[in-house]
Amino acid sequence: MDPVAGEQDEKSYGYDFIWETAGKQQVVSNYCFYGDYLAKKGMLEQVRDFFSQGGGKNGDVANHNYDKALPWPFDEEDYIDVVTGCVAREQLRAHPAEQPFYMMVSFCGPHKPYDAPQRYLDMFPLEREDDFILPEGQIISDEDKESLYRQRRSAKAMIRLIDDQIGETLDVLRERGMLDDTLIVFTSDHGDMLGDHFMIQKGVPWKQSVGIPLAVRLPGAAPVGENIAPVEISDIAATVLDYAGLDAQRVLSRSWPAYNDIIPSRSLLPVLRGEQERVRDFCFSE
């Protein structure tokens, strides 16, 4: 996996600019634009050593292969999600304000290894609340609880850091007069068990793992509040295309790279405009 070498292949999906990270764990063994950034600053091997220290695998708590939740030991400006936010804002500042654009900004956190910078950790006390949802008769050792408490704290800190990065990015849109014309979609790919059901990380069909947020700001539309109808991440594609005035089903029915014949994508604009309550009765997840 080398996003730097495969940049032209990735542009075949329609992007004019790509700056991709392999992820905190993958940067240990793979190269990417974030790895290139670190290498140019002479930091790559140091960061790889740090990432190799802590980061357990998916599975149950009992395997003791849990994350050490060590704070990021380098400058905050070099943290993966801070760099990602800075690159996004650079692109927005360079883009002609009168031209339409599509931008996907994918932050790595909150994700293992739990490595929030100390400044953000200091915003949250280390709460030792033994409120884990567990199978009947299941017990978590004090050692494992302490690790999970640290992970929970770091997850909150990483979310706060991402909040700040999103806020700064919205500020750029506002400063350039682009905010009121921009459809904004906020979501994630998965949640985290963080000790519930005696599990860590993801990959199981519990609410903590598959229940993720989808928040949308539609310019010119009155807020419709909270809607608990099921949606899929794939619905974002049709929603964006529909908002851009394109025939989503025609565009997504191409043989490559789309796969709409396998996982249909449905526009959420009717829901966002308050015209209907839902676009699907069930969703698919794996």
Regions found by a protein language model. Name each.
Residues E10, K207-G211, I263:
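Short, solvent-exposed loop/turn segments at the edges of secondary structure
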Residues I236:
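Catalytic core of tubulin tyrosine ligase-like
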Residues K24-P230, D242-A258:
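Active-site-proximal cap/lid insertion segments
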Residues E275-E286:
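Short beta-strand/turn segments that mark the catalytic/cofactor-handling region
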Residues D2-V28, L126-I133:
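Acidic, His- and aromatic-enriched active-site or binding-groove loops in soluble protein domains
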Residues M1, D189, E286:
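Active-site glycine-centered loops adjacent to acidic/histidine catalytic or metal-binding residues
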